[in-house]
């Protein structure tokens, strides 16, 4: 099973366990909203919040949600800025490309994606560090976090998440066999 199929089953199972309550999902650094909107379309018993610092990205996400008839909440802010409450899941595809690598990217990436969406600062991990540090304040007990990561960031993500107290930290490979998704669970102590 690939990660998308596994996650669809997981969101539906989480919804079943919450009975009539909606599963609360935060898509942080949402960009076009494709991750959060896809979750909403696959599992209707979710309450999806899409958050991004870019007004332009949120405009695209809003259009995508409208075109797909997906009911979502949009919030503009820098990471957790303006986010209230706790979530069952935090999903994030933050900028993760090291600054010095961006110039060497394929033209279809570097010339068509805003630098804001790509630049993960010096080592590509800056946004992960910030999100991992703050995420426990926004996760329900046993809340889960999912990150899209760069192909060579798996070991660093395991260390960062484990050091912050996440359990069951795993890195999942994509169809090419490269590290692509890092996941973990945060339990209240």
Predicted regions: what they are:
Residues 1-92, 97-103:
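Conserved SAM/SAH cofactor-binding pocket of Class I
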Residues 39, 109, 131-135:
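Class I S-adenosylmethionine-dependent transferase superfamily signal
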Residues 73-75, 116, 170:
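Structural signal for short hydrophobic segments within the conserved structured cores
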Residues 96, 185-188:
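C-terminal beta-strand of the catalytic ATP-binding
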Residues 96-126:
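Mobile active-site "lid"/loop adjacent to the S-adenosyl-L-methionine
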Residues 122-186:
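Conserved Class I SAM-dependent methyltransferase catalytic core
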């Amino acid at each position: 099973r690939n990660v998308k199929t596994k996650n669809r089953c997981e969101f539906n199972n989480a919804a079943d366990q919450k009975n009539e309550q909606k599963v609360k999902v935060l898509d942080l650094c949402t960009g076009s909203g494709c991750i959060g909107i896809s979750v909403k379309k696959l599992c209707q018993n979710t309450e999806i919040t899409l958050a991004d610092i870019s007004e332009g990205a949120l405009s695209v996400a809003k259009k995508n949600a409208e075109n797909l008839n997906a009911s979502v909440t949009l919030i503009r802010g820098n990471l957790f800025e303006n986010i209230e409450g706790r979530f069952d899941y935090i999903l994030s595809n933050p900028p993760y490309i090291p600054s010095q690598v961006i110039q060497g990217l394929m033209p279809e990436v570097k010339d068509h994606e805003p630098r804001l969406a790509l630049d993960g600062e010096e080592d590509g991990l800056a946004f992960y560090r910030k999100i991992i540090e703050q995420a426990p304040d926004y996760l329900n007990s046993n809340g889960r976090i999912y990150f899209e990561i760069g192909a060579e960031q798996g070991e660093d993500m395991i260390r960062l998440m484990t050091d912050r107290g996440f359990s069951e930290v795993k890195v999942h490979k994509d169809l090419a066999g490269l590290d692509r998704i890092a996941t973990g669970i945060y339990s209240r102590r």
